[in-house]
Amino acid sequence: MQIIHDFIRGGFIMSYTAQYQKAVFDVLNSVFTTEAEKIDRAGAALCSSFQKGGLLYVFGCGHSHMISEELFYRAGGLAAVYPIFETSTMLHEGAAKSSRIERMSGYAELVMERYPIGENDCFLVVSTSGINSFTIEMAQAAKRRGAYVIGISSGAYLSKPSRQKDGLHLPDVCDLAIDNHVPAGDAIVQVCADGTKAGPVSSIASMAIANSIVLSACEKLSESGTEPVVYHSGNCEGGDKLNEAIIAEYQKRIRCL
């Protein structure tokens, strides 16, 4: 998507925050307009998985791991979500180290061996660049186990060289690839004279896509006569009690509950 960089409106230059807000709206509008059919297909796949007793596994490296947290154990979130929190690829145990590990080949299979993902499950993998070995090989490992693989990445990186040994990009190995319409480099507001930008948009875009997939699945479940199992807010009256029943049902299948 071509994001408009002419931020002069009404004879004055828009502030950085106004530029950012406009760019966020532009990205989300592009996503919801262009990717609607794919989001609907992802929702259908997820609905089918749940009807067969499957789970939604979610994975991302670095900041993309936040999408796993976004969908897991939260008010309004589906119960049948199994996040893959691989701490070596998260920032709290060494940010620079996580970047190096994300580019490693051969580690993904060791991670996937710890999870009982199978043919009734869906696997949502998020990587805006979609060029690093770990994420691509996680998607491949999930496919080998029979899961339906949904990828979220940016089409802006398809022209960039992949770091994966076979030159693959994330969309190449997914059953369904959804474009988050994030520009290469992620940040969108120029803040330095040399062209350096701030204000990343990938987390907002990818979370919006992920929650849209969830809502699509909920709608399809409801239409088929099955009420989706959704967590309640523990900060509202009665929420804890309702959630206790959900946890009791799923904690044997989802270790991190």
Where are these regions (language model features)?
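Short, Lys/Arg-enriched N-terminal segments with co-localized hydrophobic residues
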Residues: 1-13
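Generic N-terminal amphipathic, Lys/Arg-enriched alpha-helix
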Residues: 13-34
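A short, well-structured juxtamembrane/interface segment
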Residues: 34-49, 111
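Glycine-rich phosphate-binding loops that contact phosphosugars or nucleotide phosphates
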Residues: 57-214
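YjeF_N-associated NAD(P)HX repair module
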Residues: 192-257
